[in-house]
Amino acid sequence: MTKIAVVVPTIRKESWEIFIQGWEPLFKKHRVLLVKVEDNLEWPYVETIDYGFDHIAQTFKPFPKFEWLFNKSDTCRNAGFYIAKGFNPDVYMSFDDDVLPNDNDPIQEHLDALQMTVPKHWVSTCQDIYPRGVPYGVRGEIEVVLSHGVWANVPDLDAPTQLLYPNLKDIAFNKMNVPKGVLFAFCAMNFAFKPQLLPYIYQAPMSKRLAEYGVEVGDRFGDIWAGVVAKLACDEMNLGVVTGHATINHTRASKVFVNLRKEAIFMELNEQFANEWQNDDTTNEYVLLYKKKLASWQADLAKL
């Protein structure tokens, strides 16, 4: 049976209670290791609940103060990935604490997506089948290692778009592979990946702790930029990425003006982040910090 570790960052007791009620049947079905990263104190602590046996819980309190961990943001999920690695899972998944399954099984949908092989450069214009013209020789070129899930109900939009479309619900998504050389907007509220991607899935430094390094304080790009870095790594390693195969219900709309303040600092950098990341001569202070912390993350993972 596939060993699955599910990482969930949380700061809200009420959200956690609803989350567990909605997800526990699937956690029991798939016998997952649940890794809860609680980040509402001065420093996060991590609790593991193994649904493969009885409800065995172990608490790490507080989490070790590794220099790559930035708390007080959803990038604290890095702590969960680190702890999960010690259990040697076959698949890592992560969900936000305000998402729920619909009448589906998102865990199985991710597992199915990670069994796929896909073209390196081609995409299908049809759902679940290749149309006439896609060469047979390219249809299973590369192994999928990252499944980016999507959401029903409340969409994950940036603040300016939220202001333009305040009542938007249930936007449409495509099931597709993301070809080599193409980037996409990665949202960490619902995704799964294989172990070989763990060194590159590190969620980018965010939150007020950036000020300790002389970098302007911003937020809400930790998962976006992690997605850029992970996709570039997949391209380099000839590994595949798919999106749209696993769907959850996103239940909570975030506060638009709070989001606007958090996003404003990094909006300009987001326009050029991929280029700055790939530029060996970059002088951007944030990108240099990110690269330093990513190297620290990879070094600590290698010790496990």
Give, region by region, the residue ranges found by the protein language model.
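Active-site acidic Asp-centered loop
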Residues: 95-97
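Short catalytic/ligand-binding loop motif for oxyanion handling, primarily in non-cytosolic enzymes
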Residues: 42-43, 100-104, 250-253
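Active-site-proximal specificity loops/subdomain of glycosyltransferases
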Residues: 40-88, 104-108
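N-proximal low-complexity "stem/linker" segments adjacent to membrane-targeting elements
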Residues: 1-28
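Conserved catalytic core of nucleotide-sugar-dependent glycosyltransferases
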Residues: 55-64, 101-209, 283
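Short, polar loop motifs at secondary-structure junctions
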Residues: 13, 35-42
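Short aromatic/hydrophobic "clamp" motif used to bind/position activated sugar donors
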Residues: 92
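C-terminal catalytic/acceptor-binding lobe
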Residues: 5, 15, 159-162, 168-304
